Design a protein with these regions (language model features):
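Pocket-flanking alpha-helical
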Residues: 2-7, 22-62, 71-86, 103-107, ...
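Short coil/turn segments
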Residues: 1, 69, 78-82, 97-102, ...
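Pocket-lining segment of extracytoplasmic ligand-binding domains
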Residues: 128-133, 138-180
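Short beta-strand-to-loop elements that line the ligand-binding cleft
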Residues: 18-26, 43, 117-127, 165-166
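Short helix-loop capping/hinge motifs at secondary-structure junctions, enriched
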Residues: 13, 79-88, 115-117
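Ligand-binding cleft/hinge of the Venus flytrap
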Residues: 5-17, 57, 103-123, 138, ...
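Short beta-strand and adjacent tight-turn residues that come in two discontinuous sequence segments
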Residues: 24, 43-44, 64-66, 96, ...
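Short loop->beta-strand "edge-of-pocket" segments that line small-molecule binding or catalytic clefts
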Residues: 87-100, 140
Length: 180
């Protein structure tokens, strides 16, 4: 929201900047686009950037500003589908977009919470279909950002009282979040 506000208020323009914001497809897709020069800047998970740089030493991409000091990575579920805490994922269907930053951290989250990942059925989903699939009951929970998944579910008519948010940072995953 701050970036759109800055465009709307003319803040970028007054500094001589012509800024265009394009929809992203997750941190794992944004980082290589910056590294290859397709985009001059991106908004991505710092942990995904560290992993990318480990796999691509010398890649010309760096973080210049932390935006989230606590990542919004979450498992967002529906209480009516039995998902309220990490252990509830065992036996559940988890919708996860492969390039999602929260999904990238799921193995560490699962380990920190002693989850038997063999008991979690993972359904690869797209970003646009993630929350609709949860709202329709096709999955029991999804990986995503706590605030955007919550707002998307509310917009789709899921009652607030039925939405559960398992913030990974509150369950053993102590990481920084997104950076520019």
């Amino acid at each position: 929201a701050p970036y759109f506000l800055a465009i709307d208020k003319g803040f970028f323009k007054s500094e001589g900047l012509e800024v265009e914001i394009t929809p992203g497809k997750g941190s794992l897709a944004a980082i290589p686009k910056v590294a290859t020069g397709a985009f001059p800047f991106g908004f991505a998970d710092i942990n995904s950037l560290i992993k990318f740089l480990d796999q691509n030493p010398g890649a010309p991409v760096i973080a210049i500003m932390m935006v989230y000091d606590k990542p919004p990575f979450a498992i967002v579920g529906r209480k009516s589908r039995g998902v309220e805490k990490p252990k509830d994922l065992e036996g559940a269907v988890l919708g996860a977009p492969p390039p999602d930053g929260a999904w990238a951290q799921f193995p560490s989250f699962a380990k920190a919470n002693n989850l038997d990942v063999k008991k979690v059925k993972v359904e690869p989903v797209g970003f646009p279909t993630r929350e609709p699939m949860l709202a329709e009951g096709k999955v029991d929970a999804v990986t995503g950002y706590s605030f955007s998944s919550y707002l998307n579910l509310a917009r789709l008519g899921v009652p607030e009282s039925d939405i559960s948010t398992i913030l990974m940072a509150d369950y053993g995953l102590k990481l920084y979040g997104n950076a520019i």
